[in-house]
């Protein structure tokens, strides 16, 4: 039933392309809501997989709200880009690739937006090598993870202004 109605997500690029690719591979419709400032190369790459791309809002959070609205109105299955344990586990396979390519790696630096990527990477990296140090890196003007850690709970920033569009998230996920 999900396949017939289609998938929807909000993303500034990488997750968008992943969902679009998977939908094409499994023969279902994908609608991707991206912030209006998303680089054209990411928009075009997402479209190249057959997804319907909707540009909406200034930042990820605006696109997310609109994607949720469309999901509810149309019965689409929403695939969250970071606040989903299965998605985070998939993103964690990056750690496996890093360790295979660099067996003596001591540190892995991970960009932090919503927190899913660092949750997945740190989980798998630590399973493969408990001594690996994982360092999260986030923009000063979109430091939602830092704010959450300082507050001891998820908080929403007033804004998330950064050129690093994949990390421009006002609040980290509460599941990862």
Say what each PLM segment does.
Residues 7-10, 15-70, 124, 144-157:
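Active-site-proximal loop->helix
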Residues 9, 55-56, 78-81, 110, ...:
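General beta-strand structural signal in soluble alpha/beta enzymes
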Residues 1-6:
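Helix-rich "cap/lid" substructures immediately adjacent to catalytic or cofactor-binding pockets
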Residues 68-71, 97-99:
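N-terminal small/polar loop signature for handling phosphorylated ligands or for N-terminal nucleophile
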Residues 20-21, 26, 83-176:
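Glycine-rich phosphate/pyrophosphate-binding loop at beta-loop-alpha junctions
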């Amino acid at each position: 039933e999900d396949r017939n109605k289609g998938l929807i997500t909000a993303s500034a690029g990488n997750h968008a392309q992943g969902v679009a690719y998977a939908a094409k591979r499994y023969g279902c419709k994908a609608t991707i809501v991206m912030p209006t400032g998303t680089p054209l190369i990411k928009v075009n790459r997402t479209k190249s997989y057959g997804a319907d791309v909707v540009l909406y809002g200034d930042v990820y959070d605006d696109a997310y709200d609109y994607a949720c609205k469309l999901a509810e109105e149309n019965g689409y299955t929403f695939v969250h880009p970071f606040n989903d344990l299965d998605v985070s586990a998939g993103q964690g396979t990056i750690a496996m690739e890093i360790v295979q390519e660099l067996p003596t790696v001591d540190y892995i630096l991970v960009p932090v937006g919503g927190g899913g990527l660092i949750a997945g990477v740190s989980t798998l990296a630590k399973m493969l090598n408990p001594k690996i140090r994982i360092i999260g890196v986030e923009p000063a003007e979109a430091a939602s993870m830092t704010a959450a850690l300082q507050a001891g709970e998820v908080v929403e920033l007033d804004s998330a202004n950064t050129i690093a569009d994949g990390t421009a998230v006002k609040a980290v996920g509460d599941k990862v």
